[in-house]
Amino acid sequence: MNDRKYLNNEWKFSEDAETDATVSVRIPHTCKEFPYHYFNESKCQMRCKYERPLFILDEWKGKTLLLTFEGAAHNAEVFINDEPVYEHRCGYTAFTIDITDHVEYGKSNRIRVILDTRESLNIPPFGEHSDFLAYGGIYRDVYLDVKEKMHIQDVYVRTHFPSGRAQAISRVKVANPEPAVQIRQGIRLHGSDNDYTDVGYVSATKGTMAFSMGSIRRWEPDDPVLYDLRTELLAEGKVVDTVITRVGFREAEFRKDGFYLNGKKIKLRGLCRSQAFPYVGYAMPDSMQIEDANILKNELGVNAVRAANYPQSPAFLNRCDELGLLVICEIPGSRYIGNIKWKNQELQNTKEMILQNRNHPSIILWSIRVGESEEDDDFNQRISGLARKLDPDRATTGVHRKPKEHMVEDVYAYNDFGAGLKGAACCRKSEVIPDMEKPYLISAFGGVSYPAKSGDDEARRLGQALLYSNVLHDVEQQVDVLGSFGWNMTDYNAHQNYGSGDRICYHGVMDMFRNPKLAAAAYQIYQDEVPVLELSSSLSFGENPMHSLGDVYAYTNADVLRTYRNGEPIQEYEVTKGMPVRIDDFVGNCLDAESDFTEEQRKEIRNQLNHKACTGSFMEVREKKGFFGGKKTESVDESTLTRLYEKYILGNTGLVPE
């Protein structure tokens, strides 16, 4: 039976691989901590060293010992007792080493990892400066599995619905199988205490089993039902190994007019996610990876996430399964494709990404094109063929650099960073895709188009939020666009020639600490589970030029918005789903108490007061001709308007939306 021991403690570290490792650290660990901003990113590029003792019990003789690193960025050379045993050249996928024949039993052994984090490495995602930092360190879990010589290596489950009935085909790979050994599988609802329902037996040398279930519940974004598939290895009737594989039964289909899950059309409304955090880069524990998924689904209200530029944490993907959050999983890289050695490594990365993650029901697309890279049909065909071989049921995509490029993927993806900056909020499908019969996805928008800091003035933060609102609303209206992904969930560290010159790209709808900006509300108002009401303004006259309030918007998922002044109603606004409400009346019927003015004058005065509140100045008053606001009235001079402005606007103790 499997015995897993986590090895996240007792590590020693040195920033120089040639010196003794003396600094005590725990995993996850970053090779270099940074300030929040204004730092030299080259300081995290090094050949560093990690060391740890590992006592191997004498009773483990005859077992198989498997040492796994879930994430070591970026080129890892592993030594056991000074003997080189493995080299792994990807910082974003896990690797497992069979150390059975490399350890001494009944003794303390020493694990040493020489980690090269330099961006000069000839491996993805490196080759030219991307906008994100890749950091360095052993930043995901490390553990040792103690198994029998004959054990289960992998369980791959494919789900289908022929004639509407759920069917699963599982392929089990067994290490050192014997002819008489059998595989037994059973299934039950995840989290249930009920007994497993047996679904069949098969010889370990065959390893493939199919079974049907009539009463299965499908995995849905709003009801992400999961099942535990138990796979047991039986030798002479005795269980020698057990693996629990969590699966979800669902059908994902990409058509020219949209994305369909279990036959129902879903508009993908998501954000791109970077796994970076302040100070420590990638080195955050599983709890924070899980929290990011929680934020995306429960706080921001998105239904999808693009795990951009590299494969992300198993803990993050597991939580997406549990939440019903749809995922695009992506190979490492951005813009650059290197030489043959670089390409071969990317093929290996693709293989590892798919083999390690293909049982996740949340993953609906493999993004297998180096994002925004120049066209390389031969290379792209090789990756595409590999993906289809390893996972025939899941569609593929890839972010294209330009419109109308040749596509080998199932879904054409394009970063429309011009969206929201022109007349039509985003490009039409016909402007981008080479074949209108293929599905089209906006893989990124926003970001560099309109960065905004949390500390920027209200107008800047509102501008970013309105861009998101306009694009999201436009995508909702385009029936032949699968959906869109805003860039980005959070701000993130970048190279000097990107971002704002302080090593941060302020592209997020949240800051690096996961505090929401106003743009977050552009997503939040699409969900109905939690009431949302967010004002774009503090209603402070000192915030904007000319002692004005500027443009004031309310983001809400209510059907109707009402505003009040000191408990008295001002105005009522109808709300368009997914769009903010512009608040342009701060007076309402307050002027009814001013009996010295006619109804027409009160109407014009209200327009004047609201205009000055928003812009800082009155509209032109042409007193000599008896005109006020372009209409003939009894004369109302500017001093009277100023007096009323001070009374009803400056004297306002607070606009209250409801």
Features from the language model and the residues they span:
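Extracellular recognition modules
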Residues: 112-114, 228-232
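Short glycine/proline/serine/threonine-rich loop/turn segments at secondary-structure transition edges
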Residues: 60-63, 103-108, 212-226
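Catalytic cores of secreted or luminal carbohydrate-active enzymes
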Residues: 128-151, 488-493, 498-658
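Substrate-binding/catalytic cleft of secreted carbohydrate-active enzymes
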Residues: 294-295, 304-526, 530-552, 567, ...
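Beta-strand-rich binding/interaction modules
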Residues: 78-80, 165-201, 209, 550-572
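Extended carbohydrate-recognition surfaces in non-catalytic/accessory domains of CAZymes
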Residues: 1-70, 121-129, 135-138, 545, ...
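Active-site-adjacent substrate/metal-binding segments within catalytic domains
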Residues: 31-69, 73-81, 86-89, 117-124, ...
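Accessory beta-strand-rich segments of carbohydrate-active enzymes
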Residues: 5-6, 11-16, 45-154, 177, ...
